[in-house]
C-alpha cells in the first residue's frame, strides 16, 4: 500500500488507485497521474551492480527472464527510466539454468509451532575490492568484476551444505571445501565460478566419486572458528557405505582435483588394531595377495569393492536379487581358503535347495577343490558328520545342523575362520544364525562373518537386531537406483492393476454378513467388540479384542458362563475371518472350500453351539446353495483378479510366440512366468484355471514341505526337480507360495505376477527380484481397492525409507570391536585378478554329500571344547578375586583322652543324712499357718490307671521324662502276682548253666581249648543249609523236671516267657500285701547282666563239631 502525498498518519486514507487492477484504463490513468517517487538506484556506465538481479514474482515460480537485447553500454533514456518499474535478470553466461525442484529439506526438521526463520539470509554489503585486471572467462561474457554476486552464491551454497551436514549427523565429508575451497578469497578462481554455474544434469557432469565417497579418502574439513562452533559428537557411530551420491541444492559436489579418481576399483587394507595374534595357521606367502576371479568375464566394480571390504571386516551385503551375492561370497571363501592352512569355512543357508545351488556356484567360480568340500544336512548320520569334520575344510550346511554339531562337540569352533550367512535378514531373535555366532564367540575370537541378503529388514529395530546378532561392523547396500549397478540391472516395467468386487462376490458378502451379524451384535452388546460390519473382521483384530476384554474389569469380574460364551463367539468368528479374506482377495472357490471344512466340523455331535447356529442359519444355507453349482462349473472364475491373470498370461505367451515352434520343441519354452500367491488354496485354483490352456500354458504348483488338510507338501527333492524342469522349459509357469520368494535360483523369469499384496517390504522385494536379471522383465501387481492397495503403498514406502536409513548409517550401532583383523599387522594384501583353474573333479554333477553306508560309524562321545586360557579343574572362590592369600598354619589337633568310667557312689553318699532330712522338712516341707500343713512326696501308687497313660495337654506337650515315667509305670503294672515262682525258676536255670559250662570247658575238643592252643579266634559258626548235612553233630540234652534245654533257650527268651501278660487282672498296688515277700530275691537288672555275660558262650555251645585234626 502506498502512502498519500500529505503527511497524514491515518492509514485508512489511501488513494483509490491502490485497488485498481493493472492493465485497465483506470490503471493507466492512475499510473500517469501518480506522483509517488519511484525506486532509484545509482548505476555506473556500462556496469550492472549485483542488485540488478531481481526475481519475477508474477507467477509464483523462480523463472529466469530472457536477457534484454539492448546493449549494456547504451545510454538509457530519461523517459524509459521514469516509466521502468521492474528490472530483469541479465545472466553473465550463455547457458541457461533449468528449473530445480527440491524434494527434501536442507535443515533438520523442527516442530510446527516453532518459527523457522529464513533458510539463508543475504549478507550485508561489503566494501568493493579493486577490479582484477586479467580475469576474463570468455569473450562473450562480461568482465569478472561481479565477484560479489559469486560470493553471495557461494555463501548460500555453504549455508546449504552446513544445514545438510547437520541434518545427517555431521559425519558427511564436507563438500563445501571441494566446491568452494577459498571462500575468504577476494576473487574466486574461474574454475570455481564455472563449476558454480554448471547446472544441467548430464551424466558427464556426475563426479567420479559419486559412488566411492569413503571417509578415509575425503580431504580434511576446513572450518573456521568464526563461522562454526565446536564439533558435536554424534550419538551413534556412523558407518556410511559406499555407492551413495551426495550433492547440494545446486548439484555442487565437485571432486577435488588433488584426489585420484575413486570411481571403479578401490584399494583397501585391513584395519590397524591392537589385538593378539590369531591362533589359525596362516600361509605366509599367500596372505600378501588376494585373488579376484575373472572367470565370468567383465569385472564389476561394486563386486570388486565389496569383496575387498568383506575380507577385512564383518560385512553385511544388501544387494538386489541377481546381482552376484554368491560370486562375492565365493571370492571371499577362496581367499580365506588360500590364506589359512587348516582352518574351516562354513556356508549356511536356511534350506537344503538354497545350500545346493550355492555349491555349484562356488565350484565353478572359486575353484575350491571338491575333495575338500562337503554338504551336511540333518539326513547324514552323526558318525558320518564327525568324519567329515575331521577331514574337510569347506562346509555347506543348514544352520540347525551346525548348531547341533557345535553343541555335541563334533565340530571344533576354534577351527572356523569364516562364516557366510545367506538370507541374513532371518538372523533375529533366537534363530539358528544367532545361536551359531554366539557359540563361536565363546570359543573363538578370530573369525570373519559375511552376511548376504536382498532386504536387511522392514524396521529399524529388525535391522539393528541383524547387526547385533551377527556382529556386523560394516554395511554395503545397493538399491536398483544406485548408479554403479544400473548398467547391470535391466528395466522392469511394473504395472499395478486394481479391481472392484464382482457381482457374485457382493452377493456372497451380503449373505455372509447376515449370517455373522447376530454374533457380532452379541459381542457389541457386551462391549467386547466395537465393529459393526462383519466383513471387516480379521483374525488379528478379534484376538486383540478378546485380550482387551479379558483384561478389562468386565472380563475379570464376569462369571464362568459369560466368559465361556465370549470365548466361543470369538473363536468361531476368528475361524471365519480367514474365509472373509479368501473371499475378498483370493476368490470364491477357496472361500467355498473353507466353508465346507467349517461345515464338516459340525457333523453329528461335533462343533459348539455357535458353530451349529451359523451352519443352521438360513442365510448360510442359501449361500452354500449358490456356491455349490458355481464351483462345479469348470468355466467359472470366482474373482476378477483371476480373470485378468488369465488374460495377462495368455497375452504374454502369444506375444512371445509360444507354441509356434516345431512339434519337437513345443515342450521347451523361451519365456517363463512366475506367479506368487499367499495360500495353497489360491495356488491350486490358479493352476486349475491355467491348465485349461495347455500346452500353451504349462503351469505347476510350488509349495513348501509341510502338509496341510487337503494339500500335501513337497519335499526338498521334489522342489529341486521342479526348479530344474522350470529352467529347462518343461514348465513355463510356476505358481509359488512364499517358498519361491527367498533365494532359490529359478532361472530367468520374464513376467512376475503378484496375485496378492504383501504388507512386508522384504517379501515384496524378494518377489520382484525374480525378474530383470539378464533381460528386461515385467511385474504385474493385482490389488483390490481398499486395504490391499493401501498395504502395497505402505510396504513400498517403508522399503524406500528403510533403504535411506540403512544407507545413512546414523540410526544404527555397528560392532567394530568384534570384527578382528586376523591377518598379521603390517600385511596389506594386493589384488590379483586372474583366471581361476577349475579342477576336473569340480565338473561332477552330483552334490558332494557323504555317501550313506550300510552300517554308519558309531557316534563319537561328546567332546567339551574349552576357550583359550581357561583353567580346568576346580578353583577356590578365594582365587577368583586375584588376590594371593597365604595359607594359615594348621594347628595339630589335641588328642582327646579316652573316657574312663566313673565309679558309682555308695548309697550312703547319695541319701540325705538325718540332719539334712530334718532341714529339708523344716525349710521346704512345712508351711506355717494356723493349722499345720506338710508337703508330701508324690505317691506313685495313687491313681495308677491315670498315671500309666499320658494326660491331655493344651499348650505344652509332655516332656521326655514324663514319657519315660509313663513307660516305666506301664511295665510295672504288667508284673504278675506269681513273680516269686518265676524268679526261682530263673535262678535254677542259672545254676544249671554254670555246671554245663564247666563240663564243656573240660572236654578236649571244645572250641575254647582249640582257640587257646592255636592262638587264634574260633571260627564263626555257620548255619547249615537245607541241603547240607552236619558232620558228627552231637546235641547234648539235659533232663530235668521242667524238660528245659539250656542250649536252645536263652535267658532273654525265658524272661520274655516269664514276662508275658496273663489274662487275670493284676491287683492294685494298694491291695498288695508285703508279708509274702520275705525272701531277698535279686533284682531284674542283675539277672540280665549275668545272662548277657554268658550270651556268646551259650551260642557256641549249641552244636559241637568233631575236630578232624584230633583223629
From Swiss-Prot:
GO terms for biological process: double-strand break repair via synthesis-dependent strand annealing; interstrand cross-link repair. Its EC number is 3.6.4.12. Pfam families: Helicase_C, ResIII. Residues 132-143, 215-238 have a biased composition (Polar residues). Residues 644-818 form the Helicase C-terminal domain. Residues 852-864 have a biased composition (Basic residues). It is found in: Nucleus. A motif (DEAH box) lies at residues 422-425. Keywords: ATP-binding, DNA damage, DNA repair, DNA-binding, Helicase, Hydrolase, Nucleotide-binding, Nucleus. GO terms for cellular component: nucleus. ATP binds at residues 319-326. Residues 1-81, 101-144, 210-240, 259-280, 836-898, 998-1047, 1092-1111 are annotated as: Disordered. InterPro entries: FANCM/Mph1-like_ID (IPR039686), FANCM_DEXDc (IPR044749), Helicase/UvrB_N (IPR006935), Helicase_ATP-bd (IPR014001), Helicase_C-like (IPR001650), P-loop_NTPase (IPR027417), UIM_dom (IPR003903). Its main location: nucleus. Residues 1-18, 47-65 have a biased composition (Acidic residues). PROSITE patterns: HELICASE_ATP_BIND_1, HELICASE_CTER. GO terms for molecular function: 3'-5' DNA helicase activity; ATP binding; ATP hydrolysis activity; four-way junction DNA binding; four-way junction helicase activity. It catalyses: ATP + H2O = ADP + phosphate + H(+). Residues 306-474 form the Helicase ATP-binding domain. ATP-dependent DNA helicase involved in DNA damage repair by homologous recombination and in genome maintenance. Capable of unwinding D-loops. Plays a role in limiting crossover recombinants during mitotic DNA double-strand break (DSB) repair. Component of a FANCM-MHF complex which promotes gene conversion at blocked replication forks, probably by reversal of the stalled fork. Belongs to the DEAD box helicase family. DEAH subfamily. FANCM sub-subfamily. Interacts with the MHF histone-fold complex to form the FANCM-MHF complex. This is ATP-dependent DNA helicase mph1. It comes from Neosartorya fischeri (strain ATCC 1020 / DSM 3700 / CBS 544.65 / FGSC A1164 / JCM 1740 / NRRL 181 / WB 181). The gene is mph1.
Amino acid at each position: 500500500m502506498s502512502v498519500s502525498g500529505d503527511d497524514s498518519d491515518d492509514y485508512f486514507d489511501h488513494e483509490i488507485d491502490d485497488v485498481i487492477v493493472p492493465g485497465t484504463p483506470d490503471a493507466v490513468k492512475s499510473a500517469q497521474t501518480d506522483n509517488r517517487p519511484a525506486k532509484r538506484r545509482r548505476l555506473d556506465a556500462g556496469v550492472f551492480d549485483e542488485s540488478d538481479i531481481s526475481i519475477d514474482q508474477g507467477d509464483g515460480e523462480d523463472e529466469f527472464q530472457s536477457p534484454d537485447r539492448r546493449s549494456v553500454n547504451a545510454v538509457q533514456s530519461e523517459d524509459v527510466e521514469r516509466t521502468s518499474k521492474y528490472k530483469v535478470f541479465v545472466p553473465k553466461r550463455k547457458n541457461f539454468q533449468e528449473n530445480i525442484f527440491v524434494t527434501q529439506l536442507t535443515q533438520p526438521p523442527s516442530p510446527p509451532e516453532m518459527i523457522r526463520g529464513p533458510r539463508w539470509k543475504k549478507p550485508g554489503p561489503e566494501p568493493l575490492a579493486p577490479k582484477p585486471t586479467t580475469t576474463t572467462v570468455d569473450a562473450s561474457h562480461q568482465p569478472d568484476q561481479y565477484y560479489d554476486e559469486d560470493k553471495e552464491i557461494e555463501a548460500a551454497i555453504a549455508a546449504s551444505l552446513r544445514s545438510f551436514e547437520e541434518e545427517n549427523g555431521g559425519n558427511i565429508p564436507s563438500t563445501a571445501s571441494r566446491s568452494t575451497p577459498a571462500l575468504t578469497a577476494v576473487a574466486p578462481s574461474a574454475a570455481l565460478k564455472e563449476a558454480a554455474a554448471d547446472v544441467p544434469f548430464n551424466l558427464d557432469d556426475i563426479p567420479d566419486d559419486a559412488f566411492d565417497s569413503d571417509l578415509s579418502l575425503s580431504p580434511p574439513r576446513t572450518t573456521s572458528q568464526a563461522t562454526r562452533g565446536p564439533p558435536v559428537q554424534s550419538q551413534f557411530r556412523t558407518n556410511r557405505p559406499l555407492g551413495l551420491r551426495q550433492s547440494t541444492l545446486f548439484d555442487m559436489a565437485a571432486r577435488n582435483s588433488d584426489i585420484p579418481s575413486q570411481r571403479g576399483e578401490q584399494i583397501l587394507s585391513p584395519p590397524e588394531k591392537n589385538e593378539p595374534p590369531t591362533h589359525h595357521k596362516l600361509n605366509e606367502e599367500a596372505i600378501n595377495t588376494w585373488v579376484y576371479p575373472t572367470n565370468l568375464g567383465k569385472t564389476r566394480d561394486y563386486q570388486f569393492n565389496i569383496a575387498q571390504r568383506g575380507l577385512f571386516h564383518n560385512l553385511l551385503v544388501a544387494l538386489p536379487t541377481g546381482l552376484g551375492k554368491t560370486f562375492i561370497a565365493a571370492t571371499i571363501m577362496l581367499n580365506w581358503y588360500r590364506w589359512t592352512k587348516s582352518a574351516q569355512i562354513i556356508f549356511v543357508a536356511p534350506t537344503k535347495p538354497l545350500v545346493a545351488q550355492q555349491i555349484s556356484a562356488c565350484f565353478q567360480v572359486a575353484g575350491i577343490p571338491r575333495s575338500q568340500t562337503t554338504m551336511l544336512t540333518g539326513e547324514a548320520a552323526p558318525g558320518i558328520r564327525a568324519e567329515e569334520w575331521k577331514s574337510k575344510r569347506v562346509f555347506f550346511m543348514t544352520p540347525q545342523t551346525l548348531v547341533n554339531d557345535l553343541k555335541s562337540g563334533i565340530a571344533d569352533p576354534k577351527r572356523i575362520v569364516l562364516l557366510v550367512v545367506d538370507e541374513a535378514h532371518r538372523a533375529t531373535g533366537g534363530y539358528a544364525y544367532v545361536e551359531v555366532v554366539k557359540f563361536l564367540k565363546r570359543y573363538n575370537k578370530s573369525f570373519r562373518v559375511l552376511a548376504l541378503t536382498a532386504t536387511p529388514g522392514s524396521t529399524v529395530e529388525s535391522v539393528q537386531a541383524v547387526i547385533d546378532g551377527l556382529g556386523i561392523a560394516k554395511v554395503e547396500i545397493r538399491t536398483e537406483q544406485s548408479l554403479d549397478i544400473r548398467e547391470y540391472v535391466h528395466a522392469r516395467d511394473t504395472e499395478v492393476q486394481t479391481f472392484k468386487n464382482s457381482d457374485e462376490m457382493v452377493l456372497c458378502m451380503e449373505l455372509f454378513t447376515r449370517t455373522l451379524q447376530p454374533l457380532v451384535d452379541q459381542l457389541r452388546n457386551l462391549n467386547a467388540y466395537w465393529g459393526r460390519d462383519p466383513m471387516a473382521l480379521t483374525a488379528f483384530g478379534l484376538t486383540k479384542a478378546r485380550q482387551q476384554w479379558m483384561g478389562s474389569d468386565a472380563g475379570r469380574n464376569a462369571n464362568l458362563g459369560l466368559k465361556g460364551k465370549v470365548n466361543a463367539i470369538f473363536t468361531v468368528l476368528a475361524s471365519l475371518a480367514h474365509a472373509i479374506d479368501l473371499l475378498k482377495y483370493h476368490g470364491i472357490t477357496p472361500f467355498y472350500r473353507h466353508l465346507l471344512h467349517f461345515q464338516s466340523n459340525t457333523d453329528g455331535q461335533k462343533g459348539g453351539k455357535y458353530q451349529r447356529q451359523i451352519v443352521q442359519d438360513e442365510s448360510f444355507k442359501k449361500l452354500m446353495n449358490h456356491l455349490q453349482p458355481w464351483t462345479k462349473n469348470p468355466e467359472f472364475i470366482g474373482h476378477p483378479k483371476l480373470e485378468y491373470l488369465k488374460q495377462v498370461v495368455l497375452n504374454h505367451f502369444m506375444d512371445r510366440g509360444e507354441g509356434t515352434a516345431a512339434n519337437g520343441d513345443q515342450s521347451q519354452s523361451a519365456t517363463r512366468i512366475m506367479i506368487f500367491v499367499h495360500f495353497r488354496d489360491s495356488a491350486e485354483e490358479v493352476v486349475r484355471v491355467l491348465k485349461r490352456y495347455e500346452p500353451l500354458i504349462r503351469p505347476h504348483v510350488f509349495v513348501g514341505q509341510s502338509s496341510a488338510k487337503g494339500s500335501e507338501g513337497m519335499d526338498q527333492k521334489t522342489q529341486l526337480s521342479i526348479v530344474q524342469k522350470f529352467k529347462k522349459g518343461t514348465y513355463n509357469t510356476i505358481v509359488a507360495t512364499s517358498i519361491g520368494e527367498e533365494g532359490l535360483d529359478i532361472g530367468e523369469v520374464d513376467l512376475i505376477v503378484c496375485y496378492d499384496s504383501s504388507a512386508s517390504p522384504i517379501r515384496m522385494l524378494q518377489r520382484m527380484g525374480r525378474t530383470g536379471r539378464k533381460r528386461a522383465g515385467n511385474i504385474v501387481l493385482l490389488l483390490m481397492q481398499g486395504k490391499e492397495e493401501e498395504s502395497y503403498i505402505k510396504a513400498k514406502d517403508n522399503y524406500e525409507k528403510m533403504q535411506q536409513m540403512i544407507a545413512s548409517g546414523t540410526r544404527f550401532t555397528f560392532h567394530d570391536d568384534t570384527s578382528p583383523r586376523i591377518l598379521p599387522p603390517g600385511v596389506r594384501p594386493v589384488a590379483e585378478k586372474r583366471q581361476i583353474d577349475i579342477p576336473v573333479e569340480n565338473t561332477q554333477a552330483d552334490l558332494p554329500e557323504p555317501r550313506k553306508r550300510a552300517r554308519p560309524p558309531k557316534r563319537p562321545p561328546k567332546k567339551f571344547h574349552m576357550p583359550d586360557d581357561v583353567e580346568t579343574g576346580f578353583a577356590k572362590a578365594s582365587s577368583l578375586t586375584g588376590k594371593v592369600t597365604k595359607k594359615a598354619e594348621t594347628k595339630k589337633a589335641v588328642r582327646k583322652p579316652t573316657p574312663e568310667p566313673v565309679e558309682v557312689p555308695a548309697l550312703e553318699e547319695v541319701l540325705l543324712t538325718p540332719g539334712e532330712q530334718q532341714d529339708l522338712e523344716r525349710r521346704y516341707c512345712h508351711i506355717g499357718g494356723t493349722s499345720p500343713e506338710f508337703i508330701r512326696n508324690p505317691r506313685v501308687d495313687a491313681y495308677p490307671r491315670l498315671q500309666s497313660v499320658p494326660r491331655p495337654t493344651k499348650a505344652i506337650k509332655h516332656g521326655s521324662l514324663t514319657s519315660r515315667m509313663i513307660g516305666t509305670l506301664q511295665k510295672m503294672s504288667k508284673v504278675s502276682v506269681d513273680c516269686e515262682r518265676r524268679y526261682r525258676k530263673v535262678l535254677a536255670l542259672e545254676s544249671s548253666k554254670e555246671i554245663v559250662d564247666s563240663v564243656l570247658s573240660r572236654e578236649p575238643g571244645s572250641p575254647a581249648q582249640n582257640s587257646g592252643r592255636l592262638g587264634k579266634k574260633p571260627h564263626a559258626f555257620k548255619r547249615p543249609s537245607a541241603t547240607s548235612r552236619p558232620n558228627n553233630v552231637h546235641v547234648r540234652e539235659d533232663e530235668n523236671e521242667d524238660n528245659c534245654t539250656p542250649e536252645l533257650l536263652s535267658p532273654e527268651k525265658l524272661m520274655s516267657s516269664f514276662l508275658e501278660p496273663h489274662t487275670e487282672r493284676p491287683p492294685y498296688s494298694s491291695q498288695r500285701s508285703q508279708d509274702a515277700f520275705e525272701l531277698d530275691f535279686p533284682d531284674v537288672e542283675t539277672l540280665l547282666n549275668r545272662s548277657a555275660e554268658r550270651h556268646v558262650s551259650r551260642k557256641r555251645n549249641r552244636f559241637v563239631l568233631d575236630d578232624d585234626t584230633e583223629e
